[in-house]
């Protein structure tokens, strides 16, 4: 590809295709059967975030495909694609034909798991993914419909638009990678460090509150600074209860306003 920015890589058992955004538009280089060919490409990939293939664990492709086959339940006509997933985040995705569920991998080759938020492991991975690189956040919420949602200040800008702060909302659902959406918010909110939040405590609160309940009544958790305490609090809401907890999970409902 030379110095042209790479926007997509497709790999199957029989061929490798690499798409670059060159001076004359998108160009795809394809290796198949020892022969390299090129073709112009009509695609929305022209707007995709370019990436450096060397930053991806291409040496782990055999183990990636093995893991994907195990999780998807099929290795039929596997295809691995590296391309922007959302908001500048480039992921590896393995699909099959006939189609099963796609399996996503990070650049280092680690799998993006389907999560069980009632376990410490599931909550920890979801929280880490949703927080990303944000050193401070406005709020962290969990609910069964969306998974973990983190609102954090836009790190690359200290300015406001129309008097509203720029906020990045990052959502990590149980089955999909993080999806980021910029938004404006004029509501006041004190920031806190997400490292103060223990995923084991959150998982225990979800597990304890959801036992013997219908799935629709799995609790919603909200971690923020809304109770004017020195550290964030965890608010737990179900259809028939509202409690507030400290970061160790202790019920402090009667101690806060």
Question: Across the structure, where does each feature detected by a protein language model lie?
Answer:
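Extracytoplasmic low-complexity, Pro/Thr/Ser/Ala/Gly-rich segments
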Residues: 1-41, 115-156
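A cross-kingdom feature marking solvent-exposed beta-strand/loop segments within repeated
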Residues: 2-5, 45-52, 75-89, 111-126, ...
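Extracellularly exposed regions in secreted/surface proteins, prominently low-complexity, repeat-rich
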Residues: 92-134, 174-175, 183-187, 200, ...
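Short, surface-exposed beta-strand/loop "edge" segments at domain boundaries and coil↔beta transitions
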Residues: 23-29, 99-103, 155-162, 240-245
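Compositionally biased P/S/T/G-rich terminal and signal peptide-adjacent segments
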Residues: 19-45, 161-182
């Amino acid at each position: 590809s030379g110095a042209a920015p790479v926007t997509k890589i497709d790999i199957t058992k029989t061929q490798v295709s690499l798409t670059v955004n060159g001076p004359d538009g998108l160009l795809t280089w394809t290796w198949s059967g020892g022969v390299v060919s090129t073709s112009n490409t009509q695609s929305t990939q022209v707007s995709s975030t370019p990436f450096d293939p060397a930053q991806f664990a291409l040496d782990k492709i055999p183990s990636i495909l093995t893991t994907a086959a195990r999780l998807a339940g099929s290795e039929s006509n596997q295809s691995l694609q590296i391309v922007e997933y959302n908001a500048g985040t480039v992921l590896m995705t393995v699909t099959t034909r006939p189609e099963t569920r796609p399996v996503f991998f990070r650049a280092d080759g680690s799998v993006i798991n389907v999560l069980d938020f009632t376990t410490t492991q599931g909550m920890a991975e979801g929280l880490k993914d949703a927080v990303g690189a944000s050193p401070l956040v406005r709020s962290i919420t969990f609910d069964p419909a969306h998974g973990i949602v983190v609102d954090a200040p836009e790190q690359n800008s200290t300015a406001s638009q129309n008097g509203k702060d720029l906020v990045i909302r990052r959502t990590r659902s149980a089955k999909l990678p993080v999806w980021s959406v910029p938004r404006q918010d004029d509501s006041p909110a004190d920031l806190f460090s997400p490292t103060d939040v223990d995923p084991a405590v959150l998982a225990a609160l979800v597990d304890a509150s959801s036992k013997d309940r219908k799935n629709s009544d799995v609790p919603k958790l909200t971690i923020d600074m809304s109770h004017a305490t020195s550290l964030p609090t965890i608010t737990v809401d179900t259809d028939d209860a509202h409690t507030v907890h400290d970061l160790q999970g202790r019920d402090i409902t009667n101690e806060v306003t």
